């Protein structure tokens, strides 16, 4: 069959704040897929440079010189309103603005990008990594999210998957995925805690596992706590120290800030294995006296002091999770560490103090979540048998009722999928309509919780206050995404909605973004093809000039002149930035003329064979080896005065060695 078949594999993607990772089930085992750059994780960074969109390592490499157009840690903004991200905005060098309906947007070059679009670019990179490995198109995925992500953030992540061209079969919490990876081959019943401190969020989940059943008992966390915050305390310290030394405030210099961010991240990582680290940033800035260099020493003890408040913030969620699970710390059999920040020795000490045991360091904190996502993909695809995952919702869901009160319908840590119904009524006589305001959170008053949606139930028949019977149904699917309906018993009139992300992405906007992503993919492909044609033309010029130089005595002067003319045509096309077709045409013409070198030399060899006494001594067997290729050399080619291998048109030119 010539038609390329789509993969039956459901890939697992850990869409992280700092790094992302993709995995797939192979032969009953989850395998992390290495990227085209040769890495097992990819930076979750997207940059815009001219007409190019860079993702991953290429985006990270140019961040220092292009901080305003390099978007990192955008996961901290997904599914959130501008009013909710005040602390996050202060930590990024790029512009964050409020969209038309209060959404977070990133203005760049006159366009406004949403966090979903940026997340989609990272997911496209993960998708392409999997496709390159599997050798077939991939359309289905399981994507992980922090356990403490609310409904809006989960729905936004699913939308990002759709924009990337993926059918998101399941959204699962990161700690749950880690538990799957850890417990898939474990025998016996165990209660485990998953302590997940990543780049942007902190989660703690308590699970019971046994006989292939993974049941989440409780979850808690802080979506405003992660590795970025630890970087920030180092950056703040560096700025203060430099100001003391030089009297210069680096906080207003975006390029310097990006360099400090990179230095802070490097120092943080090094201090997990060393007691101190040197921070050297030459030419960080300059004043009237010349360039200034930043040179500092940061000890592990001082870093722990700087970050002590952040580490302390992990304690309360752990204690709440244990209380919600109705367990004592001594009931926990194993504690898994997930997320890069869990490598910090002070963090591990806190985990030990909370749970009274050494945490398990047997899983790779950077890869275990993607591995778990791939296992869940295997479960959904039928490749993994006898595994049942019972997850929970992290926060209570309810509606606003009379007096601005939050009335919960589904309590936090309820196992999903689930459906809950409750009867409500009107607050005034002959009330023709009710507005259902859907809330998520744990506070008693509606205004203190997060509004995740609202809709109206209209045309209620006139009746005294309290008489109409309005049945409100909350239906939560396996992704933890909420569907709400309200039905008037008297009229049978019903209104239902799927709670959209608070980012406010409507279906037509998602479709536009899907089309934009596809269009960008095509444009990127064209740009790559154009670049390949230019590079090939440039190589062709080099090879043609080398062939003329090396074999000038063996080919007619007229042919040399023809080839030189064609070389100039290609060079002019490149210099004038001619269309790709014109460059290719000129390059192909040069290629055809280069083949004439072989023909001329074979003709000369025939003549030489007929009159060996009169002409130069040319071995016809050697000439049979002469050939020319339009392709660049492959493998290792050696070159010397006596022995030279040039690949030029499906034929290799080999000079006869001088004995």
Swiss-Prot record:
Disulfide bonds: none annotated. This is Chaperone protein DnaK. The keyword DNA-binding does not apply. PROSITE patterns: HSP70_1, HSP70_2, HSP70_3. The lineage of its organism: Bacteria, Pseudomonadati, Chlamydiota, Chlamydiia, Chlamydiales. Residues 571-592 have a biased composition (Basic and acidic residues). The modification Phosphothreonine is found at residue 201. GO terms for molecular function: ATP binding; ATP-dependent protein folding chaperone; unfolded protein binding.
């Amino acid at each position: 069959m010539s038609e390329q078949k789509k993969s039956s594999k459901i890939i697992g993607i850990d869409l992280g704040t700092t790094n992302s990772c993709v995995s797939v089930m192979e032969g009953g085992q989850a395998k992390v897929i290495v990227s085209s750059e040769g890495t097992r994780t990819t930076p979750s960074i997207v940059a815009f440079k001219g007409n190019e969109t860079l993702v991953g390592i290429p985006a990270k490499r140019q961040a220092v010189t292009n901080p305003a157009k390099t978007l990192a840690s955008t996961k901290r903004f997904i599914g959130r309103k501008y009013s909710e991200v005040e602390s996050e905005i202060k930590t990024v060098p790029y512009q964050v603005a409020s969209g038309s309906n209060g959404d977070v947007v990133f203005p760049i070059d006159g366009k406004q990008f949403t966090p979903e679009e940026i997340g989609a670019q990272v997911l496209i990179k993960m998708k392409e990594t999997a496709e390159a490995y599997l050798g077939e198109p991939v359309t289905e995925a399981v994507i992980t999210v922090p356990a403490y992500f609310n409904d809006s953030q989960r729905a936004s992540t699913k939308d990002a998957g759709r924009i990337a061209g993926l059918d998101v079969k399941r959204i699962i919490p990161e700690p749950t995925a880690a538990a799957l990876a850890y417990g898939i081959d474990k025998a016996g019943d165990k209660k485990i805690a998953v302590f997940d401190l990543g780049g942007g969020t902190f989660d703690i989940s308590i699970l019971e596992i046994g006989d292939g059943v993974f049941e989440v008992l409780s979850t808690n966390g802080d979506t405003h706590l992660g590795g970025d915050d630890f970087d920030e305390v180092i950056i703040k310290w560096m700025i203060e120290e430099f100001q003391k030394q030089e009297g210069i405030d680096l906080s207003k210099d975006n390029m310097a800030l990006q360099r400090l961010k990179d230095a802070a991240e490097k120092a943080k990582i090094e201090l997990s294995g060393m007691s101190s680290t040197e921070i050297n940033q030459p030419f960080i800035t300059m004043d009237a006296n010349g360039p200034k260099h930043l040179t500092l020493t940061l000890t592990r003890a001082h870093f722990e002091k700087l970050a002590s408040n952040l580490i302390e913030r992990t304690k309360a969620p752990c204690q709440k999770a244990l209380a919600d699970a109705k367990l004592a710390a001594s009931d926990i059999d194993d504690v898994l560490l997930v997320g890069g920040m869990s490598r910090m020795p002070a963090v591990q000490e806190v985990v030990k103090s909370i749970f009274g045991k050494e945490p398990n360091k047997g899983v790779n904190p950077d890869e275990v979540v993607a591995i778990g996502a791939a296992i869940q993909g295997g479960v959904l695809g039928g490749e993994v048998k006898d595994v049942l995952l019972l997850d929970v919702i992290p926060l209570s869901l309810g509606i606003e009722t009379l007096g601005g009160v939050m009335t919960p319908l589904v309590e936090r840590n309820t196992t999903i999928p689930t459906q809950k119904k409750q009867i409500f009524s009107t607050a005034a006589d002959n009330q023709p309509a009710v507005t259902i305001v859907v809330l998520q959170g744990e506070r008693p008053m509606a205004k203190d919780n997060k509004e995740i949606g609202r809709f109206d139930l209209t045309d209620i028949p006139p009746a005294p206050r309290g008489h109409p019977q309005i049945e409100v149904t909350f239906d939560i699917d396996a992704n933890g995404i909420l569907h709400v309906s309200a039905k008037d018993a008297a009229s049978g009139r019903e209104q239902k909605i799927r709670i959209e992300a608070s980012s406010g992405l409507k279906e037509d906007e998602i479709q536009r973004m899907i089309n934009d992503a596809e269009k960008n993919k095509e444009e990127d492909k064209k740009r790559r093809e154009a670049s390949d044609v230019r590079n090939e033309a440039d190589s062709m010029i080099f090879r043609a000039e080398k062939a003329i130089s090396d074999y000038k005595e063996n080919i007619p002067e007229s042919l040399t002149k023809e080839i030189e003319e064609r070389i100039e045509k290609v060079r002019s096309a490149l210099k004038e930035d001619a269309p790709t077709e014109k460059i290719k045409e000129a390059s192909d013409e040069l290629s055809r003329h280069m083949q004439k070198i072989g023909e001329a030399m074979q003709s000369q060899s025939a003549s030489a064979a007929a009159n060996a006494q009169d002409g130069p001594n040319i071995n016809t067997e050697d000439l049979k080896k002469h050939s020319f290729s339009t392709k660049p050399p492959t493998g290792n080619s050696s070159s010397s005065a006596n022995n030279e291998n040039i690949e030029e048109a499906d034929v290799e030119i080999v000079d006869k060695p001088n004995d």
